[in-house]
Swiss-Prot record:
Belongs to the eukaryotic RecA-like protein family. RadB subfamily. Involved in DNA repair and in homologous recombination. May regulate the cleavage reactions of the branch-structured DNA. Has a very weak ATPase activity that is not stimulated by DNA. Binds DNA but does not promote DNA strands exchange. PANTHER family: DNA REPAIR AND RECOMBINATION PROTEIN RADB, RECA/RAD51/RADA DNA STRAND-PAIRING FAMILY MEMBER. GO terms for biological process: DNA recombination; DNA repair. Pfam families: Rad51 (PF08423). This is DNA repair and recombination protein RadB. One of its GO terms (molecular function) is ATP-dependent DNA damage sensor activity. The lineage of its organism: Archaea, Methanobacteriati, Methanobacteriota, Thermococci, Thermococcales. ATP binds at G38, P39, F40, A41, T42, G43, K44, T45. Keywords: ATP-binding, DNA damage, DNA recombination, DNA-binding, Nucleotide-binding. Coiled coil: none annotated.
Length: 228
């Protein structure tokens, strides 16, 4: 028996972009890890911030790169007629400075995240691994296991931002630790930069949506919007 429309809506968080919501089968799903990867300045952080801004519930935001901007979040809120202070108060920010701190922070989320939270973001999961030249993907897998536990036990959506590298074999940009993250992330979005302000989202993997779907979106003061 199919659930009601409200039940279905309650299991996803809107992205605020109609095209992206449709691409993801309604929005960012709770109880699942969504991986978003792509080159620098493609809108990945703005995407994660916007999902937190537009949905009820607190957000646990693990910022490993210093990319989270309170000023940008306030701008997005004001541009949408929302209270900037109220928007900022929803976000609980963690700033691990190295791999060890990142491991401790993610583990600590098991006791911090409760029913008041709707979203957990790690932006990005692989930055410190890349910076420190670590190939210890076993530790990365353990952190993903904790994030998967949070998604399922705490009924939250989890967004993991990932960086890219140039793969000489395929002559293309691929996500770091692709196989390790791919094992735990059921839904995968790739962001690409087309021209100033305009971006492309490609659905590389999904639990029930067809792979390869694409959506164009733009970056504005509001955050991300459909590109017409």
């Amino acid at each position: 028996m199919k659930g009601s429309k409200s039940e279905v809506q309650g299991m996803v968080l809107t992205t605020g972009v109609k095209g992206l919501d449709e691409l993801l089968g309604g929005g960012v799903a709770r109880r699942v890890i969504l991986q978003v990867y792509g080159p620098f300045a493609t809108g990945k952080t703005t995407f994660a911030m916007q999902v937190g801004l537009l949905n009820e519930g607190k957000v646990a935001y693990v910022d490993t790169e210093g990319g989270f901007s309170p000023e940008r979040l306030a701008q997005m809120a004001r541009s949408r007629g929302l209270d900037p202070e109220k928007a900022l108060s929803k976000f609980i920010i963690f700033e691990p400075m190295d791999l060890n701190e990142q491991r401790r922070v993610i583990s600590k989320l098991k006791t911090i995240v409760d029913e008041k939270f709707s979203l957990v973001v790690v932006d990005s999961l692989t930055a410190h691994y890349r910076a420190e030249g670590s190939k210890n993907y076993g530790e990365l897998a353990k952190q993903l296991q904790v994030l998967q536990w949070l998604a399922r036990r705490k009924n939250v959506a989890v967004i993991v931002i990932n960086q890219v590298y140039h793969d000489s074999n395929s002559n293309s940009l691929r996500p770091i630790a692709e196989h390790t993250l791919g094992y735990r992330t059921k839904d995968i979005l790739r962001f690409e930069k087309l021209r100033v302000g305009v971006r492309l989202a490609v659905l590389e993997r999904h639990r029930f949506r067809p792979e390869g779907g694409i959506v164009y979106f733009k970056i504005t003061d509001k955050g991300l919007e459909d590109s017409k």
